[in-house]
Design a protein with these regions (language model features):
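Glycine/charged-rich beta-loop-alpha catalytic/anionic-binding loops adjacent to active sites
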Residues: 19-27, 217-222
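Hydrolase catalytic cores
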Residues: 43-44, 66-69, 84, 211-280
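Flexible loop residues that form catalytic
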Residues: 99, 158, 187-190, 266
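Substrate-binding/access-modulating region of protease and related hydrolase catalytic domains
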Residues: 68-175, 219-233, 274-276
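Subtilisin-like serine protease catalytic core
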Residues: 1-21, 28-77, 84, 89-92, ...
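Extracellular S/T/G-rich loop segment that most often corresponds to the catalytic His/Ser-adjacent loop
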Residues: 1-7, 13, 164-249
Length: 290
């Protein structure tokens, strides 16, 4: 298992007994200074905290933590380097709760003085370049799966939609999740009428996971609630780890088969009536039966 994010608080009780291998791809300290990565890691493999279960796959004994996001975000080069490192180190699941905010990038360029048309064109060119970059990388990893341990890339769909403002205000999945070969993840939340897509969750993801009000490890100790497709992604990564363990017993483990299991067993049971399949993909991922 590998988590590429803001790092991890290795002193948190949720990670007691876990063999954590860290590599820093930023210019900042090795430690998590934000809490985002710590929270995501807790959802994947965190041990119980004060009697509360937070980890989907708490039996994971070794993880690779790549710090690719700092105070100013992160770049594609660092993410690519981290993915290559994780693959070379034998990760079979790589969880990435990160992405490119296309509308936000356009606004940033406009703030820098670029006309709207030029800012949009520049952002689109960057978007396309990133999609192609991650598709080439995913294709390379898929080709390697026949020779080395499998690796499945899982990434957050993004949080730019605003269905709470307008039900039609839906933004498409952002890079790297939109790239072919990457399993994109949408977020769902619980309502009295059943589960529903989170208002912020981008549209067009392949699968979904819980992503609203998620309780997990807090930077410095304890637990805290967070929401986002960033929180849904580690749920899917944790379930992927459980499937990887099951498939490895029969010697069938490879990235494509792992993705097929996650998509093929995903379910829409419990979803609020009238849900749009485009919002949640195949449905919420399901752990394998014992």
């Amino acid at each position: 298992m590998s988590v590429l994010d803001t790092g991890i608080d290795i002193s948190h009780p949720a990670f007691t007994g876990v063999d954590i291998v860290r590599k820093n791809f930023t210019t900042e300290s090795d430690d998590d200074e934000h809490g985002h990565g710590t929270h995501c890691a807790g959802t994947i493999f965190g041990r119980d905290v004060a009697g509360i279960r937070i980890g989907v796959a708490p039996g994971i004994s070794k993880v690779l933590i790549g710090k690719v996001l700092g105070s100013g975000g992160g770049g594609s080069d660092q993410i690519v380097q981290a993915i290559q490192w994780a693959v070379n180190e034998g990760a079979n699941v790589i969880s990435m709760s990160l992405g490119i905010d296309f509308p936000g990038y356009v606004k940033e360029l406009e703030t820098d003085g670029f006309p709207t048309e030029l800012a949009t064109s520049m952002a689109l060119e960057g978007y396309r370049a990133n999609v192609l970059l991650f598709e080439r990388l995913a294709s390379f990893i898929a080709a390697q799966n026949a020779f080395i341990q499998a690796a499945l890339l899982i990434a957050a769909a993004g949080n730019e939609s605003q269905r709470d403002v307008d039900p039609k205000f839906e933004i498409a999945v952002s890079p790297p999740a939109v790239a072919d070969g990457v399993l994109s993840v949408a977020a769902v939340g619980k309502t009295p009428q059943g589960f529903t897509v989170a208002s912020f969750s981008n549209v067009g993801a392949r699968v979904s996971g819980p992503g609203v009000g998620i309780n997990s490890a807090k930077l410095g100790g304890g637990l805290t609630l967070m929401s986002g497709t960033s929180m849904a992604t580690p749920h899917v990564a944790g379930v992927a780890a459980l499937w990887a363990q099951k498939l490895s017993v029969t010697g069938q483990l490879n990235g494509q088969l792992l993705a097929d299991r996650l998509v093929g067993t995903a379910a829409t049971t419990g979803m609020k009536a009238g849900f749009d399949p485009g919002d949640i993909g195949a449905g919420v991922v399901q752990a394998p039966q014992a």
